[in-house]
C-alpha cells in the first residue's frame, strides 16, 4: 500500500471521547495532509463543489409579512431550479447550482437577488433569521405549489408542520451550505484504500465521518456566525425565561449568539427524543426510516384527513425525512424528485453534505459572505481528514449541550462547554481548533484564495465576543435606540436599494426570465399528467422503502 494509505479510514472500533481527537491535527490527519501535498493531489480537494440555499421572508414596504402569492415573474416555486419557497408562501428560497469556487457561488446568488429585487413590486426581503412582526399563526400563509399531486404533497407537508410546531417557528430563515469533494479526489483516495473497498462505500463512510466531526464542532460555527440574539416581541408575546426586554418591542438574550439555533428556534421535544445515528450510512438511513414509519400519538390526535382536508401527510414522528432537523445532513445526488431521500441514500450513497447552522448575516446583502464560506470549507476539509470515531450516547448528549450553550449564551465571559466528560472554556477550545485549521487553510490557499485569512479573521471574534455578528447586532440596536423591527426594516431598505442600483446583466436576466416562464409551463404540464388520486399518489410514494 502506497504512502497515504492511511487516508482511508473506515469506521473504527474505538469509542474514545472526541476530546482525544480534537487537540489540533491528529497524526493520522498529518499523513493525509502530507499525501494531499504530493504533486497533482493537493489541487484535487480545491476543486470541490459548493452551493448555497438561502431563505428570506418577503415583507411589505412597512416591514410586515407579505400576504401576496409567490410572484409569477419569479416562475413556479414547484419547478424552478433556483427560486422556490420554503414553509411559507412568503418565505423565498434562493438555490444556487454547485460551483467549483466560492466566488462563483456567491456571484450567482447575487445575480438571483438582483433579479428578484427588480420583481418584488415594492416589497423587501427581511435580512435577519428571526422574522418581522407576526401577530398570529394564521397570518403566515403556507406555501402553495398548484394542484399536481407533487405540489399538493408539498403543501400538505407544510400544513402538517404548522399543526405540529406552529407556523411562527417555520417562518425562521437560515442559510445552508452544500459541499462535496470532487470525483477526482475520491478516485485518488480509492487508489490508497484496501482493494476490496468499493468507491461508493469509501465515499459514504468518509462523508459520514465528516458529518460526525462537524457535529463535534458545530458549536464553533454557531458562536462565530450566529446573528440572532434578539427578536420582535410578536414572535414570542408571552416571553421566555431566557429572554429579557431590550425595549418595549424587542426581546433579547444578553449573551446569545443564535436564538434561531436555541430552544426558542427550531428545537422541539419530539425530535429531541430521536436518536438518528451518523455512525454509518446504514444506521442513519435506518433511524430515519423508523421515524417516518412510527406513529407519534400526539400527532395522531391532530388527524390526517379530516372533513375531506389533509392536515398532514401521516401521523408518524416524521411525515417525511426532510422534517428531521439537524445541523448537518448527508445528502444523495440530486436527481429523481419522486425518490425518497432514504431510498436514494441506500441506493446511491452520500454525494454531499448540507450544513444548516448558519443564520442570515444581516451585514451582507445576500446573507452570507466569502469569509464565511471559506472558513466553512476549511472546517469541512478538516473534518473529512481527521479521525472520526463513532459517537456514543454520552458524547451525543455533550454535542447537543454544546450547541445549545453556544446558541443561548456563547458570548458569556468564561463560558465552559462539556468536553470528554470534563469542561473546556469555549474561547480556549476555539483557539485550539483555529490552530488546527491553519494547516488545512494553507493547503487550500495555494491558489491564493484567502482561506488562511478567513480562518485568522475568526480570531478577533474569539478574543472579543463583541466582534461576533450577534455582538455587533446587539451593539447596533443599543446605539441606534431602535427596536429590532425598526432596525432590521432599515437594513432591508438599504439592501433593496443596493440591488436596484446594481448594473443589469442582460444575459443573466434573459436566462432567468426564460427559466421563470418555462417553470410555469412545466408546472402546468405536471398538473395535466397526473393519473392517480392524491391518496393513491401518497400510498405509492410511501410504499417504496
Residue ranges and their predicted role:
Residues 345-347, 353-444:
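Substrate-recognition/cap regions that form aromatic- and gly/pro-loop-enriched pockets
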Residues 60-61, 96-105, 183-185, 359-368:
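A generic structural motif
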Residues 55, 169-182, 352-359:
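Histidine-centered divalent-metal-coordination microenvironment in nucleic-acid enzymes
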Residues 67-70, 106, 139, 189-190, ...:
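Short conserved micro-motifs at the rims of enzyme active sites and ligand-binding pockets
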Residues 447, 451-545:
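Extended, compositionally biased alpha-helical segments that mediate assembly or anchoring
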